[in-house]
Regions:
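Blade/loop signatures of beta-propeller domains
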Residues: 11-34, 159
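Blade-level signature of beta-propeller repeat domains, shared across WD40, Kelch, NHL, RCC1
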Residues: 276-324
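Short loop/turn segments that connect beta-strands within beta-propeller blades
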Residues: 72-77, 113-118, 155-159, 207-211, ...
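A short beta-strand motif characteristic of beta-propeller blades
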Residues: 36-41, 78-84, 119-124, 164-175, ...
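Beta-rich, blade/repeat-based domains predominating
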Residues: 44-56, 86-101, 126-141, 172-192, ...
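Residue position within the beta-strands of beta-propeller blades
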Residues: 60-62, 102-104, 142-144, 194-196, ...
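Short loop/turn segments immediately following the C-termini of beta-strands
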Residues: 56, 64, 106, 146, ...
Length: 324
């Protein structure tokens, strides 16, 4: 059920153009180690990738074998809306502040479904699948074209559907202007682009308008801890970096002076405190962390336990009540 608080949040998001949550986490924030299953293979099928949580905690996911987008608002136990689309095994989706849904179709294009529509409109044509999508505050859509080692972008104020290059020169490599099978992307309010550079085992930062990246995590960074095929990257409100470290089956947090595992820190399996190829990462407004646990065929949630050094999450009881 949508509340006045939800309405106020959505109005704020429309004003600043941000549709996702960026909680302010401390360097000591912790999450309960045992995850809750949000969607199993019975709901979303096998090996999920495309997933999104918006600013009022509505969950968007894809049932891949039925070409459906499933929408579950906060407070609902079941799916409230089903959108039948024309796509096959989409890798990514993103929802704008206006409620428009952008989805990788698997047919070398990105389609948009407006808030109340039942059919999609093609807004971007690409040469391969978009392994990640992002919509910035300047009405620009970004696509991580992993198989072509590039990130491309398109202003939706233009009349074309052909994007331009945002990062990567199209050659597989580890130089500062190259990427190797990039996956997750994130664009901050300064239009700086973060890229999970999977096969280079690093996260690259491309300042707005620049094509030479700076390594901020992984190989070549100041952090000595190894990462293995990062697949998703998120920046929180405190500018801490969260990374789905896919082949290490964990989620890590990077601050200005620390690097630590925060979820899936005990190997890979189907046990609730372990992950198996996490691919997509998102937060709700309470700071809970949602992860597509790909090879366990599920989407899971890790509940925030503490958000300051030594302090228990006093909002836990309230958030549980709000989500009922």
């Amino acid at each position: 059920m949508r509340t006045k608080n939800d309405h106020d949040k959505m109005l704020y998001c429309l004003i600043i153009g941000v549709s996702y949550n960026q909680p302010n986490f401390s360097s000591c924030a912790t999450w309960f180690p045992n995850a809750t299953i949000i969607a199993s293979s019975q709901i979303i099928g096998l090996q999920p990738d495309a997933f999104f949580v918006n600013a009022i905690n509505t969950i968007y996911m894809v049932k891949e074998n039925n070409s459906q987008i499933l929408v579950r608002p906060q407070g609902y136990l079941n799916i409230a809306r089903t959108i039948n689309g024309s796509f096959t095994r989409p890798k990514s989706l993103f929802v704008s502040a206006a409620g428009d849904i952008y989805v990788d179709t698997g047919f070398n294009r990105v389609d948009m479904y407006t808030r109340n529509s039942t059919s999609g409109v093609t807004v971007m044509n690409v040469n391969e699948s978009c392994y990640s999508l992002f919509f910035d505050t300047n009405n620009t859509l970004y696509c991580s074209v992993s198989l072509l080692h590039q990130v491309v972008k398109l202003s939706l104020n233009s009349s074309t559907t052909i994007p331009t290059v945002a990062a990567g020169n199209g050659m597989n490599g580890s130089d500062s202007d190259r990427l190797s099978y990039p996956r997750g992307i994130f664009v901050d309010l300064n239009f700086d682009l973060y890229v999970a550079d999977c096969r280079n085992d690093r996260v690259q930062l491309f300042h707005s308008g620049q094509f030479a990246g700076i390594t901020v995590a992984g190989n070549g960074s100041n952090h000595t801890n190894p990462i293995n095929c990062p697949s998703s990257v998120v920046l929180d409100g405190s500018k801490n970096l969260f990374v789905a470290d896919s082949n290490n089956n964990q989620i890590i947090q990077l601050t200005s002076n620390s690097f630590r595992c925060i979820a899936g820190c005990f190997g890979n399996s189907s046990i609730t405190h372990q992950l198996n190829q996490p691919t997509t990462l998102s937060f709700d407004s309470y700071g809970n962390m949602f992860v597509t646990d790909r090879d366990n065929n599920q989407i899971v949630k890790f509940i925030l336990a503490t958000n300051s050094c030594g302090k228990y999450n006093t909002d836990l009881a309230r958030q549980i009540k709000d989500q009922m």
